[in-house]
């Protein structure tokens, strides 16, 4: 028997997974950050779809994709290349900082020091030092050489922290020599530290809204900041003041890029414009381009004649930069300066569509989505696959057409934050074990439709997601016993990412379905999987049935209206109404007992006997009619569907019954509660 590690202090957990292709070569949402390895011509992009992708910028082919780097499960907000391009550091909304082998694309280690979204990174190239900051108001300093040396056995790392921030940090910058680090936050101020001593040296006021982007000059004497207030400010740290305010954008400035000589500012804004401005003469500016969406990040191309730009959309474009020509002679013989033509799109890395809308169908197995390109798709949540590509059809009409009049409790939620459907299973507001259905309704393709087996969607799905998990120290299965791995009905795609996380909090474990058999993954699952998961996956416990109380009484049109007794029963909520008809027929009306004819003659008795014999061969639903709220109930409906669509009241469900034929009846309803509960 497996002994699962438990801890009373452990936070409540949830399990989520993503329905996606085995290889997602395109970004499926906006791109938050870029890093260029100029030596190898590789462009790294950090996506809101939780994936870092690598692109070959030296090819003219439209196929620039090299590989994906996957281990985050929420937006990747920032990335930095270090160690001459050998390693990459990433920061994410999943509250982690990850260290990657940039060449091979695998995650080397995960840092879980932050307690909230990690928004920004800063890198001091000369010192191989990285700083991270986020919404938890904390700034941590990391030695890159130490991070890249971490192993499974040597996994302890120390960090220095910079304290004093009073609000969420959205931007961070450091000069190459690591003598100055600057943070920007929703305090609307800049805070400056000396990372060598971890001492705060000053704070600078001037912005009126969140400081979204920062650049520090190589010598550490100047800082350029961009803010949601729409301004760009130049700060002199020696004078501890703002020396210039630049107004070139109509909305917030979200990205900054400086020329090597620190004379020109390239800025990207929420207003979708990318503008080049001479820092000493802000009136000398020119529009590079107008993007299709707010600009999130900017980065030079290899020869710095162009700039890569990312936006809320998933495309990544490279725009030719205009050059500032000071050698143009004017009509009076003097020299004028002017910008050469720029703004031409020289390359584009196409992105994919992000899912923007989602509807869960009443059967609680399928969802219908609509993406940013108006494509409508049907997904099978239970089997974790795309079921049908409908194209650019009427989304609402498809939802209406495919919704059946059936009620099944919610057992999962859908998160579209990454642009791909993420299904969340838990035990909080939505109980993943609440959906019991008959197997002919839930898995008609798997069994004989005449069977009366009941299945639990949540249990089957968890068993499929963790099919390959063999916990350490578990007893090997007996050779004479059947293998109990999986759910016995279906498998899910092996490439499916499965994430264990705290409810409303940090990620604890992420793995692919196929990797659960690995020793390290198995041990990690054993340490992190919540008890409600191991109960069904390892212990093979059956989730409890949910029951519905209801009243049963004769219809006013019954031949014996004096029978007005109203009895309360309890049954499993997934019981079909035909079972209630059978109960009425067998236990209330005693239809199986041949009624005596009294003083009637033999011919009449024989006639009645023949009729009763013929009628007894009919199914109960053809002999008994159930009513609810003056509506005839479909015998194929289950109790919860009747309560949801017909009864529509908070009080106990009430049925009325009457016969469809003139059957004689006699009997009582006194023992119905116990018998209905046991049989159904």
Curated annotation (Swiss-Prot):
CDD domains: Ubl_WDR48 (cd17041), WD40 (cd00200). Keywords: Repeat, Ubl conjugation pathway, WD repeat. InterPro entries: G-protein_beta_WD-40_rep (IPR020472), WD40/YVTN_repeat-like_dom_sf (IPR015943), WD40_repeat_CS (IPR019775), WD40_repeat_dom_sf (IPR036322), WD40_rpt (IPR001680), WDR48 (IPR051246), WDR48/Bun107 (IPR021772). Pfam families: DUF3337, WD40. GO terms for molecular function: ubiquitin binding. One of its GO terms (biological process) is double-strand break repair via homologous recombination. SMART domains: WD40 (SM00320). The keyword Repeat applies. Belongs to the WD repeat WDR48 family. This is WD repeat-containing protein 48 homolog.
């Amino acid at each position: 028997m497996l002994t699962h590690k438990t801890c009373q202090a452990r936070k409540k957990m949830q399990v989520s997974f993503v329905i996606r292709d085995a290889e997602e070569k395109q970004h499926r949402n906006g791109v938050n950050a870029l890093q260029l390895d100029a030596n190898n011509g590789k462009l790294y992009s950090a996506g809101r779809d939780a994936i870092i992708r690598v692109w070959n910028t030296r090819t003219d082919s439209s196929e620039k994709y090299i590989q994906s780097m996957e281990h985050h499960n929420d937006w990747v907000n920032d990335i930095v290349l270090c160690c001459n391009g050998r390693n990459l550091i990433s920061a994410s909304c999943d509250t982690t900082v990850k260290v990657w082998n940039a060449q091979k694309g695998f995650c080397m280690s995960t840092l879980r020091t932050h307690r909230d979204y990690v928004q920004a990174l800063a890198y001091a190239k000369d010192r191989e030092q990285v700083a991270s900051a986020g919404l938890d108001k904390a700034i941590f300093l990391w030695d890159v050489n130490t991070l890249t040396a971490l192993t499974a056995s040597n996994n302890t790392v120390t960090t220095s922290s910079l304290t004093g921030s009073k609000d969420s940090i959205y931007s961070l910058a450091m000069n190459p020599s690591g003598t100055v680090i600057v943070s920007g936050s929703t305090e609307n101020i800049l805070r400056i530290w000396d990372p060598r001593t971890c001492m705060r040296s000053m704070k600078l006021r001037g912005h009126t809204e969140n400081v979204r982007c920062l650049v520090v000059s190589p010598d550490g004497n100047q800082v350029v900041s961009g803010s949601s207030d729409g301004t760009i400010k130049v700060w002199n740290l020696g004078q501890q003041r703002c020396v210039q305010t630049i107004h070139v954008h109509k909305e917030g400035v979200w990205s900054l890029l400086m020329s090597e000589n620190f004379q020109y500012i390239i800025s990207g804004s929420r207003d979708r414009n990318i503008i080049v401005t001479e820092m000493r003469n802000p009136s000398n500016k020119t529009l590079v381009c107008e993007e299709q969406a707010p600009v999130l990040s900017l980065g030079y191309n290899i020869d710095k004649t162009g700039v890569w730009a990312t936006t809320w959309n998933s495309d990544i474009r490279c725009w030719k930069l205009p050059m500032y020509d000071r050698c143009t002679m004017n009509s009076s013989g003097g020299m004028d300066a002017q910008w050469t033509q720029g703004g031409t799109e020289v390359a584009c890395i196409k992105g994919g569509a992000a899912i923007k809308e989602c509807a869960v169908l009443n059967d609680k197995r399928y969802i219908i989505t609509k993406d940013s390109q108006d494509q409508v798709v049907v997904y099978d949540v239970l089997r974790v696959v795309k079921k049908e590509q409908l194209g650019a059809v009427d989304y609402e009409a498809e939802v209406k057409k495919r919704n059946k009049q059936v009620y099944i409790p919610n057992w999962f939620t859908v998160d579209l934050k990454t642009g791909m459907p993420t299904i969340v299973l838990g035990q909080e507001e939505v109980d993943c074990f609440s959906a019991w259905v008959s197997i002919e309704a839930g898995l008609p393709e798997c069994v004989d439709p005449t069977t009366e087996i009941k299945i639990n969607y949540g249990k089957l799905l968890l068993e499929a997601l963790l099919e390959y998990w063999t916990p350490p120290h578990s007893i090997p299965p007996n050779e004479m016993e059947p293998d109990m791995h999986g759910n016995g009905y279906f498998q899910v795609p092996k490439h499916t990412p499965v994430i264990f996380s705290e409810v409303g909090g940090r990620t604890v474990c992420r793995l692919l379905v196929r990797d659960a058999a690995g020793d390290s993954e198995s041990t990690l699952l054993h340490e992190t999987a919540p008890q409600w998961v191991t109960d069904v996956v390892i212990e093979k416990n059956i989730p409890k049935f949910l029951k519905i109380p209801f009243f049963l009484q004769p219809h006013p049109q019954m031949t014996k209206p004096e029978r007005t007794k109203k009895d309360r029963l309890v049954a499993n909520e997934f019981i079909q109404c035909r079972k209630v008809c059978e109960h009425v027929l067998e236990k209330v009306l005693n239809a199986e007992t041949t009624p005596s004819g009294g003083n009637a003659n033999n011919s009449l008795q024989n006639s009645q006997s023949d009729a009763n014999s013929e009628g007894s061969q009919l199914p109960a639903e053809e002999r008994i009619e159930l009513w609810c709220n003056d509506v005839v109930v479909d015998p194929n409906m289950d109790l919860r569907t009747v309560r949801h669509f017909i009864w529509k009241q908070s009080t106990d469900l009430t049925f009325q019954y009457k016969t469809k034929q003139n059957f004689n009846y006699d009997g009582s309803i006194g023992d119905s509660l116990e018998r209905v509960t046991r049989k159904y």
